[in-house]
């Protein structure tokens, strides 16, 4: 099942407790972004259809994602740039997702000696769905990526994420999950 025909006309309430940049995804699809706290030429965020260069021949969820992916985002931090503020990914799931499968793909690239704090903030309207995400993360030499996943409210969704990529010499990838309750959450690295 694809979620291309789902409509969205709500205003997402952004966190106002601290300054941050953001990416908005609705049902896995890239909607908008704002990087007002960063140097525009040092950070690139665009919509991504799917991960064309990734190949996982023994993973059926990968084939499902490749066939039905509606998008996601590509984020790149330029060489020697340390992001001044975190980027929050507002991952919003609408109420009309019952028995739907969300397939999305994201790609994150940190060039040499760069730093980024990424917060994935999941918000759900109580529908039962399956989220199938494939993420390619490349962290070049001397770079640092801190990834924090926060589940705002209890969710009836089933979350699967496959993370692949390259971590270069003297680089660091830190991942934290703060959940208020999920039916199922599996992350494969």
Give residue spans per PLM region.
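Conserved beta-strand/loop scaffold segments within soluble protein domains that form the structured core
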Residues: 25, 37-42, 46-189
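A generic N-terminal leader/anchor concept
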Residues: 1-44, 176
